[in-house]
Amino acid sequence: MIYKSIFIDLDDTLWDTYHNNKECLEELYTDYHFNRYYASFEAFFDIYMPHNLDLWAKYRSGEIDRQTLILDRFLYVLRPLGIEDKKTVLSVNNDFLQRTTTKTRLVPGAIELLEYLRPSYRLFILSNGFREVQFKKLSNAGLAPYFERMILSEDANIQKPHKGIFDFALKNTNSRRSESLMIGDSWEADIIGAYQSKIDQIWLNPEGLPAVGFIPTY
């Protein structure tokens, strides 16, 4: 198969979302004195993280919108402290988002992969992330020069894994389905989404999770 266009997920495929976000949350924990309410940062993180992942899954499926996600993820950990004011919660979220744009830790091998691909392929980011942070993250981490364009779910008005965002990406990059490839870490969003859109896939799977329902292309 001769590929010409490669679509790559950003979060946890290139940009180390887990560690970068954890670092930001630890800064918030210190700066907002959450230690007055939680026994440790890890106790705070262990409550926040599963809830945040659940919210993102609901966002991908269309069960909730962006505003619900960004409000509820911090409201969930602040409500037990007696903090339910929407303005305060959104302020904490905005602070968190701003901090994420300054973090530059990459997934091991990310630059080497892009250096290998850039001479031979057209490269695009395909992400469910938010516009106000994704471009800054890409630029500050030194990744922007590798890509022709970033396609966001906010542009397509639909999230991965839905077929519509893949169709949107193909149309807006003048790419052919048969000559395109999707690289990502999320089995549901990236791999199932691309598979159902009849786009070949490379699954970044460092944890060695089992494929369910079909075998990815690579």
Residue ranges and their predicted role:
Residues M1-I6, H19, I111, E115, ...:
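Asp-based, Mg2+/Mn2+-dependent phosphohydrolase catalytic module
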Residues I2-P108:
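N-terminal helical cap/lid subdomain that shapes the substrate entry/recognition surface
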Residues L14, L106, L123, I158, ...:
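Conserved SAM-binding loop
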Residues H51, P119-S120:
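Structured helix-beta-strand junction loops
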Residues S120-Y121, K198:
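Glycine-centered short loops/turns at secondary-structure junctions
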Residues Y121-F124, R177-E179:
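Short beta-strand/loop segments at the ligand-binding rim of alpha/beta enzyme cores
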Residues S127:
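Conserved phosphate-coupling serine/threonine residues in phosphotransfer and NTP-handling enzymes
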